């Protein structure tokens, strides 16, 4: 792989703008090379050089007999100055500029200096932020040590004026024995501790006095904390010295250190990549321009803050030492395994298994079609009854499998265009599923469902199994029960971390607005709005099997008032959840756009209810009302999708898209907008009551649901692309991890 591609591949996606523009500099070098070739073709065999032509006017003849040392010392000169903001600025002067490509060389070094200043400034500002964060972490660790001491000595009464005998050295790092956590983190403190027993007595009350100034942060969002916030009650609580609290504090602080170490690694990689890019581009310049300027320029780079600063390396060593000692039981291998990033390895068995299940799914679909044709099931006497009972039961799997396939395609294109979806969704590092894993699960489920359909039909048509009609009817229920059992299985199989993450987010969607709304919450709720028909299928499962209709092989659900009522409610639940999420964000974030977004979902709720009422009653009044509100909801939703969720149709940008696009072909965005509008209009089909003669009504409803799932899959890609570009614009590459302790002076300062 060429360096240019490797350079881009190793970039932190959210920091792309902060990296040196290697491609731009290569383009300038090509211009220099082109100028030289053009000059050679015109018969220019010798180059005339001028020393400081733009500055002193002194000229000097260039001879190839110059020694390499002369060339090294006189090709360029780099000046370092300090700007008004206190950051270093570098300016390169070319001492010998040839007539051929002179302008391009000046542009090259001007661009290189600007890019290097940008990189150096970004690196230094981030290092300063991390040093400040290290001070905060040091205070958190001091509080943790004091908490441990107090928990180990519960009967000890203490105050700031008393001295107690506590072996605090036993809690410190072996390599840093006799030092406080502040010293370990590199913060200068007064040295009043020695290795003697008396000094321990003097240190213990000082360490324990920290507990006077701290409170526990109740950062874990729950309904109770939401109520406390509404009532303007503080979420800080007095410290209770229990082992359960200690475990929670240690777990939270461990996550803080892991994220802090991740920041350090990213910044170290940032420094290395940019330094390497400068070295590579200067070597190319020397080769093309026949100079020897790389060595001098790299000497300047080596002296700059970007490479000379060792704060990051020191912090990394201190974090490793503290983490291993206090969170890994002094087991360095275990500690470093937790700190270092988890790399997901592509496994051949995943590819093989996915291909196997794809083949099985295709084969079973063909077999199902041949079976239906050979047995003339569509023309059989019980065809209509079968479509009203079995079809809704099995269509559930089709909706879920299609949605998973669309999500797998989303992951593929997110990876291709470097959308950092694991960070956006907040997946635990190393546990995110790739598109291969999702395809494996989707086609595995598809194979299972198709096998169930064929078994059901075969048992229905086979005279030998005709007596087992009840068991035949229970086949789809067995499949649903199996899927639910796997989803909630506590054992570490079938991607447990991803399953539990999904279930947790699903619960937060159901419990809206009692939980703070994060992106995974409203993203999943939006997915559920495209699975209304699947939710109605689940309702049919409960009715068909719960009320015992499967024994008579005839559904009485639609004649039930309870079923009809819940037929409304089930369709509204996803939109109601999104509505409540928008209301909570409007109150918390004071973002007016969330109010307009809530209005969109409120309109959709009314439209869905009217459409459902029209599908049941078939009256003209219902039809007109459904027409009006469905049209408003469709127009409003389409506009919101394109303008707000996707960030397109931005007037100042070229072609009315947006300033930055990840997909290089603009036509993709125009096609996506048109397709979104068309598929949104398909939503109106239930109001239009447009039927195809050779399709059963249940089939038509399923086709409309499938089109909505496809629309949602397209929406997913551009929605996350827009979110990623927002993160890039704000250089947001790290998640915020809540701290366990809150100091009283910090609370006073915040207030």
UniProtKB/Swiss-Prot annotation:
PROSITE patterns: EXS, SPX. GO terms for biological process: phosphate ion transport. One of its GO terms (cellular component) is plasma membrane. It comes from the Eukaryota. Keywords: Cell membrane, Membrane, Phosphate transport, Transmembrane, Transmembrane helix, Transport. Residues 1-351, 414-434, 495-623, 689-751 are cytoplasmic. Residues 1-299 form the SPX domain. The chain crosses the membrane at residues 352-372, 393-413, 435-455, 474-494, 624-644, 668-688. Residues 373-392, 456-473, 645-667 are extracellular. It is found in: Cell membrane. The keyword tRNA-binding does not apply. It is a multi-pass membrane protein. Pfam families: EXS, SPX. InterPro entries: EXS_C (IPR004342), PHO1_SPX (IPR034092), SPX_dom (IPR004331). Expressed in root epidermis, leaf hydathodes, trichomes and petioles, stem vascular cylinder, receptacle, stigma apex and pollen grains. Residues 558-751 form the EXS domain. Induction: Not induced by Pi deficiency. May transport inorganic phosphate (Pi). Belongs to the SYG1 (TC 2.A.94) family. This is Phosphate transporter PHO1 homolog 8.
């Amino acid at each position: 792989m060429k360096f240019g591609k490797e350079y881009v591949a190793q970039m932190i996606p959210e920091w792309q703008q902060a990296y040196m523009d290697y491609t731009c500099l290569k383009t300038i070098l090509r211009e220099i090379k082109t100028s030289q070739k053009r000059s050679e073709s015109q018969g220019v065999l010798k180059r005339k050089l001028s020393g400081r032509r733009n500055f002193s006017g002194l000229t000097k003849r260039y001879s190839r007999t110059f020694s390499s040392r002369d060339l090294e010392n006189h090709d360029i000169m780099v000046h370092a100055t300090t700007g008004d903001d206190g950051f270093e600025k570098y300016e390169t002067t070319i001492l010998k500029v040839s007539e051929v490509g002179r302008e391009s060389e000046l542009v090259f070094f001007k661009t290189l200096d600007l890019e290097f200043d940008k990189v150096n400034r970004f690196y230094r500002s981030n290092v300063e932020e991390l040093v400040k964060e290290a001070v905060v972490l040091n205070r958190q660790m001091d509080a943790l040590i004091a908490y441990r001491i107090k928990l180990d000595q519960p009967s000890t009464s203490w105050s700031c004026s008393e001295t107690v005998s506590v072996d605090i050295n036993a809690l410190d790092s072996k390599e840093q024995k006799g030092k406080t956590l502040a010293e370990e983190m590199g913060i200068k403190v007064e040295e009043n501790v020695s290795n003697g027993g008396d000094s321990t007595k003097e240190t213990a009350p000082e360490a324990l006095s920290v507990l006077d100034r701290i409170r526990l942060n109740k950062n874990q969002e729950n309904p109770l904390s939401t109520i406390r916030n509404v009532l303007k009650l503080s979420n800080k609580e007095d410290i209770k010295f229990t082992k359960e609290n200690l475990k929670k504090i240690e777990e939270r602080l461990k996550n803080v250190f892991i994220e802090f170490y991740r920041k350090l690694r990213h910044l170290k990689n940032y420094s290395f990549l940019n330094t390497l890019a400068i070295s590579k581009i200067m070597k190319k310049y020397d080769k093309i321009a026949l100079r020897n300027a790389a060595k001098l320029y790299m000497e300047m780079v080596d002296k700059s803050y970007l490479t000379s600063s060792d704060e990051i390396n020191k912090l990394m060593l201190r974090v490793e030492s503290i983490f291993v000692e206090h969170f890994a039981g002094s087991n360095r291998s275990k500690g470093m395994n937790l700190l270092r990033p988890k790399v997901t390895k592509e496994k051949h068995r995943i590819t093989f298994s996915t291909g196997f299940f794809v083949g099985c799914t295709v084969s079973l679909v063909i077999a199902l079609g041949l079976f239906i044709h050979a047995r003339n099931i569509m023309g059989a006497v019980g065809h209509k009854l079968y479509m009203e009972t079995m079809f809704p039961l099995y269509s559930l799997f089709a909706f879920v499998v299609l949605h998973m396939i669309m999500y797998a395609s989303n992951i593929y294109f997110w990876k291709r265009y470097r959308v950092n979806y694991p960070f956006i969704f907040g997946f635990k590092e190393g546990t995110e599923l790739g598109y291969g894993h999702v395809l494996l699960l989707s086609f595995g489920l598809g194979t299972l469902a198709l096998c169930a359909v064929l078994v059901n039909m075969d048992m229905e048509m086979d005279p030998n199994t005709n007596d087992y009609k009840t068991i035949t009817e229970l086949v789809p229920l067995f499949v649903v029960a199996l899927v639910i059992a796997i989803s909630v299985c506590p054992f570490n199989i079938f991607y447990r971390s991803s399953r539990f993450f999904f279930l947790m987010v699903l619960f937060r969607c159901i419990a809206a607005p009692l939980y703070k709304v994060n992106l995974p919450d409203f993203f999943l709720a939006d997915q559920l709005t495209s699975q209304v028909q699947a939710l109605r299928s689940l309702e049919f499962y409960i009715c068909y099997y719960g009320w015992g209709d499967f024994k008579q092989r005839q559904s009485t659900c639609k004649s039930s008032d309870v079923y009809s009522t819940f037929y409304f409610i089930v369709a509204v639940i996803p939109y109601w959840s999104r509505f409540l999420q928008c209301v909570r964000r409007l109150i918390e974030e004071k973002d007016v756009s969330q109010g307009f977004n809530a209005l969109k979902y409120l309109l959709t709720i009314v439209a869905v209810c009217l459409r459902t009422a029209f599908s049941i009653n078939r009256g003209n009044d219902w039809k007109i009302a459904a027409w009006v509100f469905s049209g408003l909801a469709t127009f409003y939703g389409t506009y919101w999708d394109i303008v707000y969720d996707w960030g397109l149709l931005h007037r100042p940008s070229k072609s009315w898209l947006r300033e930055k696009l990840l997909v290089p072909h603009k036509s993709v965005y125009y096609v996506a907008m048109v397709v979104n509008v068309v598929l949104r209009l398909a939503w109106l089909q239930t109001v239009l009551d447009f039927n195809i003669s050779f399709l059963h009504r249940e089939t038509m409803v399923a086709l409309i649901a499938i089109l909505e799932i496809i629309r949602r899959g397209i929406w997913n890609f551009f929605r996350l692309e827009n979110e990623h570009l927002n993160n890039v614009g704000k250089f947001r590459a790290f998640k915020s991890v809540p701290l366990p302790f809150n100091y009283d002076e910090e609370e006073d300062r915040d207030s």
